[in-house]
């Protein structure tokens, strides 16, 4: 179940390609992805979807997966989940 509110996004809502969903599920990262703010979820998908070459899509997907595993990065920038903020 996803109760993320996407209504406040200023950019169009991006569809999740099946290969992204499959990768998230295979690695057990779907919940980590859904735990990110709506803008991050949407930005990741937009960034991956904009890639022209399959190799670039795969590279971007891997970066997203690596950042979700770490939990403290978003697009190579520091990220502190709300549950860890003081």
Regions flagged by a language model, labelled:
Residues 1-86:
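Charge-dense, helix-prone N-terminal extensions
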């Amino acid at each position: 179940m996803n109760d993320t509110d996407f209504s406040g996004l200023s950019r169009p809502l991006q569809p999740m390609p099946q290969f992204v969903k499959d990768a998230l599920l295979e690695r057990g990262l779907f919940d980590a992805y859904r735990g990110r703010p709506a803008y991050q979820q949407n930005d990741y998908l937009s960034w991956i979807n904009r890639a022209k070459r399959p190799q670039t899509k795969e590279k971007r997907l891997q970066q997203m997966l690596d950042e979700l595993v770490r939990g403290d990065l978003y697009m190579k920038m520091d990220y502190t989940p709300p549950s860890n903020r003081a």
